[in-house]
Design a protein with these regions (language model features):
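Terminal interaction modules at protein C-ends
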Residues: 1-324, 334-601
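Short loop/turn segments immediately following the C-termini of beta-strands
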Residues: 330
Length: 601
């Protein structure tokens, strides 16, 4: 169980084993925070703690740039359309534009799983030209790719080192199905990555968690399947933040001993929905969130609205001394088991180890969950209808095929964002949009007409993320981000952006050290993804600074291919006089020797 204070536990679970690095990864999430997505590649290169800071620097942390440059191109992230939260404007998000693939559920619900499939590869070169060793890891959670402070679950499954363990073929089938659920064309790179990882999941076996003697994964919503939940049990407990009448009427009409949910969700149930539930509780950990003014006015389902309190989903059953736990993304709702795309992991084992009491009563080292259960007392709900209409409009806009046309203009560059289909007609509601990298460049657009919004910009602030604000006249707001494919982007855009983010020559030396030092972990992960960083390099200003020269010479001897990968960047920076004095000449000498040595081998 992830507690609210463990914001980085899911990110920490992505870190490679010792002597391994990331080879490729694919993920799916319902709600997406782009800052949390920054943390994913950063997890493969940075040390993580629990400190959150930002100094407002115009430059990004060097370690974060290294992580993005090294790993962002290895990741495919599927996300439900309309559920990307609006983050603070940062140019560095440009490196994530091609990583995000918006999807819709084929049966009319939402794409709701929270899954990571990661493949690591040994860093050390094998003997006798053998392939590098690879290992798989699968994370199945209830927490989205966000920094929410909520109670969640995560199951970590590592590939077994022998022939025993559980097969996870349905996880691969899930991602293959998501390729067909994309709202726009999926690139060849993403398709190849998904096919390769899914194929690996067909044969790999994964070590069982402690206390578990059988494990199955259940993917819901890609096709019609019956509920995997047992029809009856001697004892039952359901923990679900969201509930609906049809779950208790159709999905599992059998009696339930205990139900734990959110009060506001229980309040929406109809009369008689809980007649077969013996005990009904709300989950009260005393959490509260101090929302900013705009968040207070945001619609109930705004993707940027922070989640607190209960968010875990657990279906626990006991029968004849055996326990079955179902954990994952599915809530106790009809939609979860009929129209949504969901995933549940079924864990089976002795009730004494895996049962309801073991789950709820805690240990000497952990507090008891049952202490946070309070008897439910109904309170009639009050939801403004305007909020629901804004959420519907958000999803409709996010589904539109929008593209950005990039072209040079008299002042630099311009991007025209346009759609062939009209935006939804919204009465008493204004729509504003702007490129994510240019928060001050807002433009009001007409409802009920195709989008046509032109923005003058610079090369470094061209953005493949288009931000939207919907504002109802009663003050209700919703904010979201839509990934937009760009047409006509100059080939040197990312290099130009990297130069701008690196900044001065001193920072370049620090960046170079990070690139040459694979175990670089000098910076707090949350500091990095939230923009904190020093503007000076460690250890001096000159090209003959000992750490830099020493690393260059070691790399020349041990891994000349790494210098070859850096050469285009150094050449590009040298052309703009962005390197420290004399560094270009030093680099040329070392690079030439490295390449000659590699050829000689």
């Amino acid at each position: 169980m992830l507690q609210p204070t463990n914001r980085l536990t899911l990110i920490d679970a992505m870190r490679p084993p010792v002597a391994f690095g990331l080879e490729s990864a694919m993920a799916v999430t319902f709600t997406l925070d782009l800052r949390a997505l920054l943390a994913a590649p950063a997890a493969f290169a940075l040390a993580g703690h629990d400190n959150l800071a930002s100094d407002g620097s115009q430059h990004e942390p060097i370690e974060l740039l290294h992580a993005l440059r090294s790993h962002a191109g290895k990741i495919t992230v599927f996300s439900q359309v309309g559920e990307i939260a609006l983050p603070p404007s940062r140019r560095v998000f440009a490196f994530l534009e091609r990583a995000v693939v918006p999807v819709v559920a084929p049966r009319g619900g939402v794409v709701h799983p929270k899954v990571w499939v990661l493949r690591y590869e040994a860093v050390d070169k094998p003997i006798d030209s053998q392939p590098r060793e690879q290992r798989l890891r699968v994370l199945i959670a209830s927490r989205n790719l966000t920094f929410d402070t909520s109670w969640d679950t995560v199951v970590r499954l590592d590939e077994a080192r022998d022939s025993t363990g559980a097969l996870l073929e349905p996880v691969g089938d899930l991602f293959e199905g998501l390729l067909d659920a994309a709202v726009s064309d999926v690139s060849v790179d993403h398709r190849q990555r998904v096919h390769s990882l899914s194929a690996a999941l067909q044969t790999a076996k994964f070590a069982l968690p402690v206390g578990v003697d059988h494990l199955e994964t259940h993917v819901l919503g890609l096709s019609r399947k019956p509920s995997p939940l047992p029809a009856s049990a001697e004892r039952s407990l359901i923990i679900s933040p969201f509930v609906s009448d049809d779950f208790f009427q159709r999905v599992r009409p059998a009696p339930i001993d205990e139900l734990v949910s959110r009060a506001e969700s229980l309040d929406h149930l109809g009369p008689g929905a809980l007649d077969k539930v013996a005990k009904v509780y709300t989950f009260d950990d005393g959490s509260a969130v101090d929302l900013a003014t705009e968040a207070e006015r945001s619609s109930p389902h705004d993707p940027g609205r922070p989640l607190v309190g209960l968010h875990a989903k657990v279906f626990a059953f006991e029968d004849r001394g055996r326990a079955r736990l179902f954990v994952g993304s599915a809530n106790a709702t009809g939609a979860a088991f009929n129209s949504n795309v969901e995933i549940l992991v079924e864990l089976t084992g002795p009730a004494a180890v895996l049962g309801i009491d073991k789950l709820c009563n805690g240990t000497m080292d952990e507090p008891s969950l049952r202490d946070l259960f309070n008897t439910y007392r109904p309170d009639p709900p009050t939801d403004p209808p305007e909020a629901a209409s804004l959420d519907s409009a958000r999803c409709a806009i996010a589904r539109l095929p929008i593209e950005g046309i990039v072209e040079e203009s008299g002042t630099g560059w311009a991007v025209t964002y346009q759609s062939r289909k009209p935006l939804p007609f919204l009465d008493s509601t204004e729509i504003h949009c702007w490129p994510l990298a240019s928060a001050g460049n807002r433009r009001r657009v007409a409802t009920g007409e195709p989008l046509e919004a032109r923005f003058e910009t610079s090369l470094e602030t061209i953005s493949g993320f288009l931000a939207f604000e919907l504002a109802h006249e009663d003050g209700t707001l919703t904010f979201f981000v839509v990934p937009v494919p760009l047409v006509g982007v100059p080939e040197h855009r990312e290099r130009f952006l990297l130069r701008a983010l690196v900044g001065n020559a001193e920072r370049f030396l620090r960046y170079l050290l990070a690139l040459l030092n694979e175990d670089s972990g000098q910076m707090d992960l949350l500091d990095a993804v939230n923009g904190a960083g020093e503007d000076t390099a460690d250890g001096g200003n000159g090209p003959l600074n000992l750490p830099v020269l020493e690393k260059l010479l070691k790399t020349m001897r041990r891994d000349p291919a790494k210098l070859a990968g850096l050469h285009p960047l150094v050449t590009d920076l040298a052309a703009d006089d962005a390197l420290p004095p004399g560094f270009a000449e030093l680099w040329t000498m070392i690079y030439d020797v490295a390449i000659e040595g590699a050829v000689a081998r």
